[in-house]
């Protein structure tokens, strides 16, 4: 896919601070900076973790995936994660898009978005 914008694919182990880093950046960037954070669709109830995701059932997730509603989706840690197709139009329009991704699925992201920029976040175990 040709992108006019930038896709930042943030990865790292659970507890490394990805959500905190993404949310802090979102809140503190100046209004004139064209950055959007993709909201993930996840097969987990709302309220687990800091991320404000769209919670769906396994069945609903499967319907969305089959209908092509995700630009990217994967399974990790017993859950399913999806990034909505709206990111495609954001990137086409020149927006920088931040995605909270999966280390194990960087290859899939690269296959779909060859110009993706992977940001690896890590913290020592004592900081988690």
What is the role of each PLM region?
Residues 3-8, 94-95:
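Pre-Walker A (Motif I) flank of P-loop NTPase domains
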Residues 19:
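Walker A/P-loop
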Residues 11-13:
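P-loop (Walker A) phosphate-binding loop of NTP-binding proteins
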Residues 40-97, 101-105:
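ATP-dependent small-molecule kinase phosphotransfer cores
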Residues 27-37:
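Post-Walker A helix-loop "phosphate-sensing" segment adjacent to the P-loop in P-loop NTPases
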Residues 96-102, 112-128:
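Conserved phosphate-donor/acceptor-positioning beta-strand/loop module used by diverse small-molecule
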Residues 16:
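ATP-binding Walker
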């Amino acid at each position: 896919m040709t992108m006019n914008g930038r896709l930042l694919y943030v990865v790292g182990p659970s507890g490394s601070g990805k959500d905190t880093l993404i949310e802090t950046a979102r809140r503190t960037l100046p209004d004139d900076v064209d950055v959007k954070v993709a909201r993930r669709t996840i097969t987990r109830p709302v309220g687990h973790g800091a991320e404000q995701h769209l919670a769906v059932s396994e069945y609903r997730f499967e319907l969305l995936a089959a209908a092509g509603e995700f630009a990217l989706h994967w399974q990790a840690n017993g859950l399913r994660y999806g990034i909505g197709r709206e990111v495609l139009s954001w990137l086409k329009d020149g927006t920088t898009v931040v995605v909270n991704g999966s280390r194990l699925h960087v290859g899939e992201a690269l296959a779909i978005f060859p110009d993706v920029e992977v940001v690896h976040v890590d913290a020592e175990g004592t900081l988690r």
